[in-house]
């Protein structure tokens, strides 16, 4: 995409650059395609991927939370993004959040030649009143058919295509001693500790799995951490549920699990399922749009969302049947 006449500089806008599925995709796009552009920039509130971006020669710009609806914050974000676009001669903006798309739609009035690509990483139950306006001049990418249908229902966009996420993972046969030192069956859940991920239902399900040799390891952090820890204590599961926080050694964690679980209430795609499959692990997941495009009866088990009893039954099934785990993971 480089040319000898006009600069071709791209700016990715994400809410954060912490550990998460969308953030990982932003990092992969920024680094994998950097040779296709003269300059690659990323703007967000920051996070653990900042250091990796810097190592790859990609400049990160810290901005306020694009999800904020406070008028003063909105004005500051508009000013910040306009400055970044002007000073770095940005020609293409790739947004990864609905409000970020809204900001760029407004800024296109000041920068009319600006090209805008928007990737929808999730399905949304709520409707953003200005969503249709935000995508009015954008080329839109949906990460799954479920996300595509969500966009079509919300904004009637005719410029949307489905491109499934891919995963670029390091190869490793190592494990994590903190996990493998535990006896019995080890279940892994790699997720942001947020309402979307359905983790209270998973913890409730663990209380119904009475086998004391079955342990759950939660890899991730988020706003529900304290609530989930308290729920674990109330159910007297402290010895069987382990909170590992954010980890950079995700592959090694997956290698240490007997199988993985994704109890999401809603999801755009379910990138963690691909990660599990790539590392030879099967998956229990909720039967919801987006996830059920990845997980099926040939590679895992699907259960209804928000159903601890069904989730517990699936956990018992895989925990007690190593041959089933192996056949699904093959």
Model-assigned labels for residue ranges:
Residues 12-74, 223-224:
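N-terminal strand-loop element at the rim of the active site
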Residues 20-31, 185, 189-208, 223-229, ...:
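A conserved mid-protein helix/loop that constitutes part of the nucleotide-sugar donor-binding site
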Residues 37-39, 199-242, 318-325:
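A conserved nucleotide-sugar
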Residues 42-43, 282-285:
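Short hydrophobic beta-strand element within catalytic cores of glycosyltransferases
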Residues 95-101, 120:
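Short His-centered aromatic/hydrophobic patch
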Residues 112-145, 154-156:
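A conserved, positively charged/aromatic
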Residues 246, 265:
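Aromatic "clamp/platform" in nucleotide-sugar-dependent glycosyltransferases that forms part
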Residues 297, 301-308, 316-323:
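Conserved acidic donor-binding segment of nucleotide-sugar-dependent glycosyltransferases
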């Amino acid at each position: 995409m480089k040319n000898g006449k006009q600069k071709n500089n791209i700016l990715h806008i994400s809410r954060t650059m912490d550990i998460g599925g969308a953030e990982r995709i932003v990092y992969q796009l920024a680094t994998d395609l950097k040779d296709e552009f003269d300059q690659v920039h990323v703007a967000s509130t920051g996070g653990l991927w900042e250091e990796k971006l810097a190592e790859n020669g990609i400049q990160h710009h810290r901005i306020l939370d694009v999800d904020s609806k406070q008028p003063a914050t909105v004005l500051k974000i508009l000013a910040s993004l306009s400055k970044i676009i002007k000073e770095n001669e940005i020609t293409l903006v790739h947004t990864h959040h609905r409000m970020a798309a809204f900001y760029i739609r407004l800024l296109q009035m000041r920068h009319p030649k600006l090209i805008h690509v928007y990737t929808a990483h999730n399905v949304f139950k709520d409707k953003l009143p200005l969503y249709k306006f935000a995508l009015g001049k954008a080329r839109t990418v949906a990460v799954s058919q479920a996300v595509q249908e969500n966009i079509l229902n919300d904004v009637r966009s005719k410029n949307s295509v489905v491109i499934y996420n891919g995963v670029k993972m390091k190869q490793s046969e190592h494990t994590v001693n903190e996990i493998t030192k535990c006896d019995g069956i080890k279940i892994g859940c790699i997720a942001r500790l947020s309402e979307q991920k359905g983790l209270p239902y998973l913890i409730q399900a663990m209380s119904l799995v009475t086998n004391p040799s079955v342990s759950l390891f939660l890899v991730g952090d988020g706003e529900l951490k304290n609530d989930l820890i308290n729920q674990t204590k109330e159910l007297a599961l402290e010895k069987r549920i382990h909170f590992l926080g954010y980890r950079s050694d995700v592959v090694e964690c997956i290698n240490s699990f007997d199988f993985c679980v994704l109890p999401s209430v809603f999801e755009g795609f379910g990138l963690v399922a691909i990660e599990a499959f790539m590392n030879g692990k099967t998956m229990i997941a909720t039967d919801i749009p987006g996830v059920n495009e990845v997980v099926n009866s040939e590679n895992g088990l699907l259960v209804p969302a928000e159903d601890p009893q069904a989730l517990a039954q699936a956990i018992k099934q895989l925990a007690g049947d190593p041959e089933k785990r192996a056949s699904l993971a093959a």
